[in-house]
Amino acid sequence: METIAFYDTKPYDKDSFDRHNNGRYKLRYFEDKLTCDTAALAKGCKAVCAFVNDNIDRCVIDALNEIGVELVLLRCAGYNNVDLKYAAGRIRVLRVPAYSPYAVAEHAMALILLLNRKIHKSYLRTRDYNFSNTIII
């Protein structure tokens, strides 16, 4: 069974990846960002999965090559954090092809509703056990 090392993972990442893995791969999670110093944690893994803030430069690519990693998977659409020219011929890099074209508009609408319905004020008040609706309505 192939092993994938996930860097810069949070508990919600683990839950999501474990739920969708269905036992196809062995998954190893690290809270550390992928750097030259932490690349060795992926020893024995076929692939590493990095996040948007991981800097995959020459040093990281060389370190991953030395331990036999063949594939870098990005959990983001952008790839400006990867030295693609240096990676060419050394290691394969795959990324999320695109996000939903509606994602930004949907998020903007959610924020507008948050302001319009005074949701944050309501949240703060209920957190303090103040359930009156005098200011909110």
Mark where each language-model region is:
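Phosphate-binding beta-alpha-beta segment of Rossmann-like dinucleotide-binding domains, i.e.
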Residues: I91-I137
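An N-terminal-biased, well-structured beta-alpha scaffold segment characteristic
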Residues: E2-V93
